[in-house]
Amino acid sequence: MSSKSIELPVLGQVLRLNCPEEQHEALKQAARELDLRVSEMKERTGILQLERVLSIVALNLSYELLQAQQKTTSIEALLQHRIQQLDHSLESILTQKVNN
């Protein structure tokens, strides 16, 4: 995986980053999403201080990430439980076949 430089317009500035080329499109999309969220937050709240708006957007993004992680953990636990149930059912069926 080789890194290549990418320029991303973020909040009226250009950030130059090195990252694997296959991540370029995702980073561009993330930069657009950040710009959009900051613009929406400024418009919705009327807050003009960029640092304050960025803090609120960062908090919202962190909250969304935490919610997604909790949902993933819950789904993983549910799937693990279901796999154990299926495994137990298969063992029971195989045991019955061997005993018959």
UniProtKB/Swiss-Prot annotation:
Family: Belongs to the ZapA family. Type 1 subfamily.
UniProt feature coiled coil, ranges: 21-45
Subunit structure: Homodimer. Interacts with FtsZ.
GO CC term (a single one): cell septum
Domain of life according to the entry: Bacteria
Subcellular location: Cytoplasm
One Pfam family per UniProt: ZapA
Job of this protein: Activator of cell division through the inhibition of FtsZ GTPase activity, therefore promoting FtsZ assembly into bundles of protofilaments necessary for the formation of the division Z ring. It is recruited early at mid-cell but it is not essential for cell division.
Gene this protein is translated from: zapA
Keywords, comma-separated and alphabetical: Cell cycle, Cell division, Coiled coil, Cytoplasm, Septation
InterPro entries: Cell_div_ZapA-like, Cell_div_ZapA-like_sf, Cell_div_ZapA_N
Name of this protein: Cell division protein ZapA
Gene Ontology terms: biological process: division septum assembly; FtsZ-dependent cytokinesis; septin ring assembly
